[in-house]
Amino acid sequence: MKVLLIRPQPHRETIGLQHVMICEPLELEYLSSNVPDEIRNSVDIKIIDLIVEKKKYEDVLRDEQPDFILFTGYITHVGIIRDMCETAKKLIPHVKTGAGGVHAEVVSTDFKSEFIDFVYDRNGIEGFNLTLKMLLGNSDISEIQAALSSAPDKSTSFSFRHPDRSAVSKYREKYYYMFHSPCALIKTSFGCPYNCSFCFCREITEGRYFARDMEDVINELKSIPEEEIYIVDDDFLFSRERLRKFIDLISEENIKKKFLVYGRADFIAENADIIAQLKAVGLQAVIVGIESVRTLDLKLYNKRTTREINEKCIKILKALDIELYATLIIPLDFTVNDFRELTAWLRNLNVRFVNLQPLTPLPGTEIFDSYVSRLLVKREDYEVWDMAHVVLKPEFMSIRRFYRELLRAYYKVIMRPKHIFALIKKYGICANIKMLAGSSLVSMQYMRKIVRGH
């Protein structure tokens, strides 16, 4: 039985970070590696990453003639996946189709379609393997759907084989994150121990948090050829004890890697010693949800941090020469003066990289229902739910002006001459040209929004 695991390209309307980063489809690699031994010789599995694949989707279907196709994606891919499943059914009438990924696990009903046979809303690896076994046993679609719907609740343990990175060997040199290239992914924990009101990640595990055994993580790290490693935990910087074990094992095994991680500002502010030790074993950059400089916003988001904590965090990372990728949420009550104050604050702290996200109450989060009446876009306009489009009506300026202020803030923070020279010195001219080209494409998407006014 021939099986294709497909990551689709984003919609052209989606304001895409794929212009400055393309990461490996780790979830599909896990599916590939965890096919049960008793059926492994009965299935031919290929991962097709259409973000970097040169063939057109229709040509892939004609050449491969799959029996089963499984798609992965975010909310922005829902419409695309529906259309791709319809195309597959028309070209290959016998093919079975499925959809998975983080959005399917939280809002599975979005994938309801006559062209999608199976939706994996929990325990994707087990559900995928169950589907394979039943398809090999000639079960019909309704029988498989019934079996999937009666599957156990979401698991809070992780005992799977390491991802099959060889399944994307033809694409690996194309995977990068900003200046981290080529870059591999690893996940050491699942869920988040905090409960920020805007966060989609915690909904995936229904608010639960669990971590892998650190020895197993280190064994996986040793098998990864890339030097640049992006640890994609929702919050890697959480437990001092666990991080100490990570530091000790990295040192004992003499692992030479460069790490990019997610971390909270309060942990960094309170644990400068641990951050320094992580720097010594390869920590290069941290993505930090600064979220806001306004106290009221931080309380509304249930962030449990303060402006002062954020400032201390930034200063610690700067002192240790650890790159900061700061993310901030821009509320819709922002005024022109608020944009100016935020820009000045970021510039005064010498923040070099920032991701400014208009407040986006994603379907599936606890804040979504509170904002339904204020939506500018349809719930079903999936491609614009990218945390870059303005989906709520700004209170004190036009949509066009809001986009203009966003773009202006980006340029005022990022495109400072002293930052550009420092980045060239640190990463080289070629890497900076690549980033400039990618960021210019994102800027053009914003410019089109400004011209159109929506």
Where are these regions (language model features)?
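Short, electropositive alpha-helical surface patch
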Residues: 56-57, 64-66, 247-250, 336-352, ...
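Hydrophobic positions in alpha-helices of CheY-like receiver
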Residues: 35, 84-92, 250, 278, ...
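Acidic, low-complexity intrinsically disordered segments
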Residues: 2-224
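Structural recognition of alpha->loop->beta junctions
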Residues: 110-129, 275-286, 343-356
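Radical SAM [4Fe-4S] cluster-binding motif and immediate context
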Residues: 167-328, 332, 341-344
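Structural detector of well-ordered beta-strand residues that form the stable sheet scaffold
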Residues: 96-98, 120, 260, 287, ...
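Radical SAM enzyme core and accessory elements
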Residues: 2-5, 16-17, 40-44, 58-67, ...
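Flexible glycine/acidic-rich beta-alpha junction loops that bind and position SAM and/or redox cofactors
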Residues: 10-14, 107, 194, 241, ...
